[in-house]
Amino acid sequence: MIPRYPSALDDFLFDVRGYLVLEQAADAQLVVDLNQSFDNFPPIKPSGWWGNAQRRDYTVETGFELHNCVEAGEPFERLIDYPGWINYVRHYCGEEKSYVEGLFIDECVASIRRSGGHHPVHSGGYQGALRGRYLYTNGVFRCGQVNIILALGDVGEGDGPTMVIPGSHKANLPNPNHGDYAKGDRMDHLEGAVPVHLKKGDALLFVDGLMHGGSSRTNPHGERRVTIYRYGPLWGVTRYGYEYSQALLDRVTAEQRKILQPVPPNRPSTT
């Protein structure tokens, strides 16, 4: 795939809305290969490990979520610096034009959601964590985390599409109808929230400070399959303490390794 770069219009819309839809961000073969990998996932109980990947569902309603999925096979490794979006995330959260320019993947998830599943709304600019903060200052973007959700099948009405509240990454006040995340409150009818429908191979890019979640999947058949890669500055750490295996670091390209391990360990010589 030819590398894609953000346009001036992309920058404007990202600034105003907090998200972009990258149509056909992934080529057809990658989507096929990822779906085959999903088909081959073994049955993993919650909190169970499969190699260096762990099933860690965000809530009981969110469905099957395999964290550290970059360790789950070669197709997931291709996503690290995929040309359909890598230049976007470098631009928005890679500390462009600074002495710490670069990226780090602090979370990567393979997600399967079936009928009835959803994800409560979370994040938003009000009292938001620095980790997910939106910032544009002195002519550069300085976002704390930018997410890429890649659709491995069409995600339309009733399929449990991601929902967002455009502009909420800049909110200075709390949403009074936010609901209770811990109780699993649904965001389907939250005023201001809109579903983001995707075609197979499309990607949703958004700053983590945007209010977002997953609408209820009402389709009784099939499942919603997506990958979620969260990018941030090179000085970040993985959210849940995962480490990338030495085998993975040795196997990927030099550029990919710089994203997985942008700051190599500094240890004393053993000789």
Kindly give the residue locations of the regions a language model identified.
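Short, charged/polar surface micro-motifs in flexible loops or helix N-caps
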Residues: W85, R113-H118, Y126, V155, ...
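Short, P/G- and charge-enriched loop/turn segments at secondary-structure junctions
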Residues: R131-N138, E191-G192
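Secondary-structure boundary elements
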Residues: H91-G102, N138-R142, L152-D159
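Non-heme Fe(II)-dependent double-stranded beta-helix
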Residues: M1-V16, E23-R133
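Extracellular structured ligand-interaction cores
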Residues: Y19, E107, C143-N147, D159, ...
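Non-heme Fe(II)/2-oxoglutarate
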Residues: L9, I44, W50, R55, ...
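Double-stranded beta-helix
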Residues: F141-Q145, D154-G213
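Short, structured patches in soluble enzyme cores that scaffold and shape functional sites
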Residues: I112, S123-G125, V146, L150-D154, ...
